[in-house]
Amino acid sequence: MLLGVFASSIVSSWLGWRNTLGSGLWKKVGILGEIHPVAKTLFTRKKVQEAERYQSGSRNLEEFSSTVTSGFDTLALVFGLAPAITWAVFTAFPSIWPCLGIAISMFLVSLAGTLVNLPFSYLETFSLEENHGMNRMTRGLFATDTLKGILVQIALSVPFSAACAYVLQRCGDMTVSGYAIILGAFVASGPVWEIIDTHVVSRLFNKFEPLRKGSLKKKLDAIMRRNGMEASSIVVMDSGRRSARTNAYVHGIGRRKRIVLFDELLKNLSEDEIVAIVAHEIGHAKLHHILFERLQSVAMTAMTVALAIWLMNDLSLYHAFGYRFVTPENLPSFRLVGFGLSVALMGSVTWILSPLMSWISRKMEKQADAFAAKEAGKDPLRTSLMKLNADNLSELAPDPMYEAWNYSHPSILPRLEAIGEVPEEDSGRWARRKTSEKKSSGRKRRRRGRRRKGTGNGKIV
């Protein structure tokens, strides 16, 4: 595991170094201006330099944070911090239900990691983001969010971990039925967590107001219906209390979807641009990207569970990481610990798959862009993406190797070039059809009016 962590750190540092060298930034800015005239006003020299400084600072902070986090993980897993916390919990509460004791000890380890990362989160918010005009959060809100996050962990993760520990205790033996039950439990927990996050957790941190009736709401409802979906709700989130960033997302299970718009998005983008952004999100559902990601998650979970069942029943795994108090008699109660160790071992090597997973994700993003261009038009989509890129101080010209390894979304120039390849006759076809239908309807009404006038009765019904 240490070798995997060391190798991933070396590769990440090398890619970050390559990215800081630059890769024809100003040449690419010039190409953006040729693709669309709006780019010349959005990506001024001052704005581009600010984005570069922001991204450089973000990378430096992330590398330092990752180094400290890796050190904490090593301390927790290799040098006995996690076993010491577990031993302390069971020593302090000798009659505690084993599954609950494991859940509490895992929460305490997680809490320690949260506290280690807290200074970096503070620096990111009140130094990096603040200096570049991205932060809207007060220190009081930061403290409240941190406390809420810890309380949510206690309320949700501890019972969930205890339930997982119980399932593994009862079904964690190396049998086909045990494997099927564990896999089914973990797969089913995904949609459950999504529902809890949507209806409970997110509402603890943000306010969601229904989008006011008007032309934008009608356009969003229409584009959903055209694609066989229904907007269960269209809401505006008060993201501007915390950040100047803009975005939107669509989520939900089945044909009923919930559209969430950041309040800053409504301020900075036109209605047609917002429709284009939502069309992109609808494209992910329509093109079965969400289904693919769920199946991908199931496949990864299946492999993880298979490895975990094999390892978590091996006493030597626990002893290797300092859990000397685990014995053949009490091992079933500690299988959740073994499961966590197995996942950590997998994580130290699965980073090798990052380029492949990133490539698949970027490909799906381009497909969703093409879908949105056909639904809402190429021009609104291009201008909306450029505005999002400029507002969020996103990197304009990352190093190709850095982008291949780390970027789940294409950088702005490849996205705009791909959108340009959408045939003009397909661009905004639904918008054109709607305009054509309106014109046709108007001509029919005028013809009917002329016929009625010709009756001589003087009435227009």
Describe the predicted segments one by one.
Residues 1, 10-333, 347-461:
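Polar-ligand-bearing catalytic/cofactor-coordination segments
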Residues 337-346:
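Short, contiguous hydrophobic alpha-helices characteristic of membrane insertion segments
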